[in-house]
């Protein structure tokens, strides 16, 4: 295995996980803030807001999991290694 390919794969795996976590992290923080604001304005709609919030958290977190899958593929099933 070429050491340059191995080193680049490790760096790319770290970047994949790190960059894949930035967007969902910001999105989850923003969504949680607006959910708290919405519950404060309409306490009777708490159940609907919480359900929509948890569903959106699941979709946002799936993006981070995709980044993790790409990182694991680069580390353990690297297509660039012959």
Swiss-Prot record:
- Which one of the record's GO molecular function terms can you name? proton-transporting ATP synthase activity, rotational mechanism
Task: Report the principal subcellular site.
Answer: plastid
Transmembrane residues, as ranges? 3-23, 57-77
Q: Which CDD domains match?
A: ATP-synt_Fo_c_ATPH (cd18183)
Which InterPro entries does this entry report, sorted A to Z? ATP_synth_csu_bac/chlpt, ATP_synth_F0_csu, ATP_synth_F0_csu_DDCD_BS, ATP_synth_F0_csu_sf, ATPase_proteolipid_c-like_dom, F/V-ATP_Csub_sf
Question: What Pfam families does the record point to?
Answer: ATP-synt_C
Q: What else is known?
A: In plastids the F-type ATPase is also known as CF(1)CF(0).
Task: Spell out the family assignment given in the record's similarity comment.
Answer: Belongs to the ATPase C chain family.
Q: How does it assemble?
A: F-type ATPases have 2 components, F(1) - the catalytic core - and F(0) - the membrane proton channel. F(1) has five subunits: alpha(3), beta(3), gamma(1), delta(1), epsilon(1). F(0) has four main subunits: a(1), b(1), b'(1) and c(10-14). The alpha and beta chains form an alternating ring which encloses part of the gamma chain. F(1) is attached to F(0) by a central stalk formed by the gamma and epsilon chains, while a peripheral stalk is formed by the delta, b and b' chains.
Q: What is this protein called?
A: ATP synthase subunit c, chloroplastic
Which organism does this record belong to? Pleurastrum terricola (Filamentous green alga)
């Amino acid at each position: 295995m070429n050491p340059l390919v191995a080193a680049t794969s490790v760096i790319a795996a770290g970047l994949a996980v790190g960059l894949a976590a930035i967007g969902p992290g910001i999105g989850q923080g923003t969504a949680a803030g607006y959910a708290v604001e919405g519950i404060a304005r309409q306490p009777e709609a708490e159940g609907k807001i919480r359900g929509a919030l948890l569903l959106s958290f699941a979709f946002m977190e799936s993006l981070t999991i995709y980044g993790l899958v790409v990182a694991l593929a680069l580390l353990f099933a690297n297509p660039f290694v012959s």
